[in-house]
Amino acid sequence: MDLIQALAAELGKDPRHVENVVHLLDEGNTIPLIARYRKELHGAMDDTSLRTLEERLQYLRGLEERREAVKKSIDEQGKLTDELTAAIDSAKTLAEVEDLYRPYKQKRRTRATMAKEKGLEPLAALLFAQERDCPRPEEAARDFVDPEKGVETVEDALQGASDIIAEQISDDAAIRKSLRALISRQGQLVSRAATEDDSVYRLYYDFTQSVARLQGHQVLAINRGEKEGILKVSITLDREQALPLLRRAVVKPGSAAMEFVKSAAEDAYDRLIFPSLEREVRNQLTEQADEGAIGQFALNLKPLLMQPPVKGKVTMGLDPGYRMGCKVAVVDGTGKVLDTAVVYPTYGERQKNEAIAALATLIKKHGVEHIAIGNGTASRETEQMAVELIRQVNEGSAHVSYMIVSEAGASVYSASKLAAEEFPQYDVNLRSAVSIARRLQDPLAELVKIDPKAIGVGQYQHDMPQKQLDEALNGVVEDCVNAVGVDINTASPSLLQRVAGLNGTTAKNVVSYREENGAFTSRAQIKKVPKLGPKAFQQCAGFLRVPESRSVLDNTAVHPESYEAAKALLALSGHTLADVKEGKLSDLPARIKAYGEDKAAGEIGVGVPTLRDIVSELLKPGRDVRDELPKPILRTDVLEMKDLKSGMVLTGTVRNVIDFGVFVDIGVHQDGLVHISQVSNKFIKHPSEVVSVGDVVKVVVLEVDEKKKRISLSMKQAK
């Protein structure tokens, strides 16, 4: 089976579509461009499917390279047979390839290699063959006693032969494959306490679970507990289940050497095979857990980045604190800083009243409509002050509301070189307040400035393979930025470098060009940016918006390569570009449907998927896909944990989705947990089948433990 067929079978896709995607990737096209503008070639796969295809393509190509390297190495030893070549070529995983290569690898000095140096290999071969006329092992060994070679006795010779046979059995790919499968089916992971002290790992102090049923979050928690020296972990398998399998593979009944080989096989299992497979199984469990956790992190990150913006509103950002006070920043509707201050609401009643008065003055002065409060230290006290403040100012003509905003990564950003370049005039603390205000206005534009790992919507992210995690999360950020589109005249370098086809250098060049020449007035002008060549332009043009352009198409997701098709479509339906600008296209979908999509697509020279995308963009030039999502919850009053009672029905926002449940912000400074058993009335394997981060959900309070700060919620009982 060739690479394309293998990928198509694995992913359940049409081989022609897979081949087209592979070709597009090999040409250097980006995933966002392929997903958005090459739908006809791949059957409209989404960006997640395309990234999975790309990842598997890299793995299978790596597998093929390893196959060739292994065959070359064995061939150079003069040991490559047709049968071995076929086995290597048909190996489906790297583990299978390595099993086949194992007997031919250069080995470190082992008991078996030392026995071979003593000339005991012929004895091992004679006994392992177990021919009918094979002499008894003790008789056969007498001829190999040689004190000069270090073989003093018959027992020494037999021990050396046994070591050679044991290693040979251990290197047998078929045996390893069978035992690996047995451990996967019937093995158990056992975790015991290494200390009597209480810890967060107490759940795993006396824990046993079958390998097949282990959950990813359990594996990651156990690994961390073991790393910290709190847990002792092992894989167990009933030895009496494994040994018969081994004996059937290597022992020939009736031979005089049968018992000797049986004993060598048991030594191979105990000393070589099982310890090796135990490490392998632990590694495989960790890899699977990492893969699942990274996938879940990416799944959680996407809706967080795609939170609907609260656009065009003057916003006050509050970065709460005790000793250093509460940092304040007021930004206008575009995120430009209008004012900053520091107040001390936690110092006492007098200081709190002074803080309220100072903030009320800022609200009145700048026409603040929303307050964004960071959810870190002193957030509860700051929220209570904000509610008093809102009550006061809303007695007049103001209509101010607030929202608690995650400040994850804000402190990292505020102390970064990027923040220093953006706000050289403000200290670190005030930069955090600006970031918090902007997170409410446009979460995506602000969060792209932060390492995705610092946003905090994953499990055990610091224990995962960082390269793999970075690739997955950066892919999500890139997909989100390109799905939304970027205003080239206002975007920061951080946002621009996430656009398909651009990088750190070209993003800075775009900003420099903008500063030197004024705002871009057309997409075509983007070609003048230094180091932004034709290929980069092809990749990025459709994702960059130019609201100031005379051509309305420059403020849509229609790619310049489809401009002529868009104009032809308008002419076909009796419309003009002026109608697009003036929003006079409400009848366009009906006209195209009446004309026939296939016929229209053929006449304007595009496929039906591209035709539909063009129609969608012409109807809403400058649209933001995030505006179609549920709006964030803005509050004017505060709820506290002591106010919660069992049976209360509340509305909250999903903050995190993990293997065992969903954390929901219900506005009390302590996220409640909806256990997986309370997420849905139907059976689900994972909460992500039902909810995503950022979803607004109804929940029922089941139980509140103020002392432990735990809130148990149910979604299924709220339905």
Label the predicted regions.
Residues 1-19, 26:
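Generic start-of-chain signal for non-secretory N-termini
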Residues 37-39, 128, 238, 320, ...:
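Short, ordered loop/turn segments at secondary-structure junctions
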Residues 73, 87, 98-101, 225-238, ...:
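Structured, non-catalytic alpha/beta "coupling" segments that mediate domain-domain communication
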Residues 55, 61-79, 89, 412, ...:
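Long, highly charged, low-complexity intrinsically disordered interaction regions
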Residues 33, 49-52, 59, 63-317, ...:
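Duplex nucleic acid-engaging cores and interfaces of nucleic-acid transaction enzymes
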Residues 546-550, 554-719:
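Single-stranded RNA-binding regions, centering on S1/OB-family and related RNA-binding modules
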Residues 181-188, 318-322, 376-378, 404-412, ...:
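A glycine-rich phosphate-binding loop feature that marks nucleotide/adenosyl-phosphate handling sites
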